[in-house]
Amino acid sequence: HLFEERLSGWEAFIEMVKDNQQFVLEQAHIDDLGFWALSPMPDAEIYGRHSYNKGASVVHNLRNYLGDDLFRQGGQAVLAAQYGGALDDVTLEAAWEEATGVDLTPWFDAHIRQPGFSTWVLDSAITAVPGEVPGYVTTLHLQQKLRACENHHDNEPLDVTVWDLAGQREVAQIVVSGQYATAEVVTDLQPAMVALNAEGRLNQGRMDLDYWISETSSLQNLPWVDLRIGCDEINAGDSALVRVEHHWAGADGAPGETPAEMAPYVEEISGTHFWTIDGLWPDEGLLLDARFTYRGGNENELDFALYGDTEADAFLAWRATPADPWVEYPDYEIQMGSAFNGGGVFKVSRLRRGQYAFANGDVSVGVEPLDSENTAEQWVFPNPARDEVNVV
């Protein structure tokens, strides 16, 4: 990966890092027959995907913990001092700490000594009116979610990217710990949108993408985020910024996750993944459509727990913000084919900002019955009919 950065530049490097991280999320635990800590590693899996692919992934995170200069300095010192030797996690940690002067126990505990992944989710961002402190102060409320591990990451450096209404971006950095965290950032730009880890410096249990739209297009397969988006309408001369985060962790309201308010018909919501859609686009004049594909045909697929037996009660759940209840999304239809093969597509005709998750439930519970006493009499003609009918 570092060679690619030197050869082709930062953007190509980050693309390679993301490609590798997506492979790790999708395939490493399948090829290696489970989720494993990098140390100790079972003998049978020492030369597997975890050692090589996830190893590269977490070393990228070490660079984010240390910064470029200290990472380079420390790496060179450790290699020079330990060349030709064998190191376990304890001696490697001591070597890096001696070379950098930084306490790296949080990194080793999070990325080396336990399996799985962590992902940080932005629950809310509130910007105060500028006062005595120069710039805009934004208070962030964050949640850390886990996949296939037990311990939350501590002292984790995290980029916070803000965009103003003109689409300019500015990056600040915070250090956060635990399941829930609050932090503040001060920026010169007035935030119109805020995102975590948009610069790709930290590999997590999530994939993300932000991109600009300036013209209509058919459905496009977006890299990394398992989503197709198209643009049906956009005003001439306008542009829109779209950001997609695909989190490989349970949605709020799933068993073991943060409790969430849900419509009465929601029986279960995905405990494996969900999306956050955000962006800078006008409320009028832009129409995006999307396709969310669910896959539950076998136990290795993310939606097996929801749809492995049947898709009969499948629906697309959505909430505008984490403070809102999960409800059935208003503008979609389901294309399932067979209801018993675990696979299908939620076809969204109008994409909105918010969080999306796959769910099960009898959505007819949310449909209020007609009040027969206050319902006007209606006539349908002709009867019988062949091509059309009239309702009066």
What is the meaning of each model-derived region?
Residues H1-H141, A148-C149:
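Hydrophobic alpha-helical and helix-loop surface patches within well-folded domains
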Residues V90, L140-T161, D283-G308:
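Surface-exposed beta-strand/loop patches in extracellular or lumenal glycoproteins
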Residues A110-H152, Y211-A236, E373-A376:
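Surface beta-strand/loop "capping" patches
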Residues S118-A195, V392:
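Beta-strand-rich binding/interaction modules
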Residues A166-I174, A323-Y332:
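Surface-exposed loop/edge segments in extracytoplasmic proteins
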Residues V185-M207, G342-S364:
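C-terminal beta-strand-rich structural cap/linker in extracellular carbohydrate-active enzymes
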Residues S214-E328, R352-V363:
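Self-processing/autoproteolytic domain segments and adjacent N-terminal interaction modules in large
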Residues A359-F381:
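Residue-level detector of functionally pivotal "anchor" positions at catalytic/ligand-binding pockets or at interdomain
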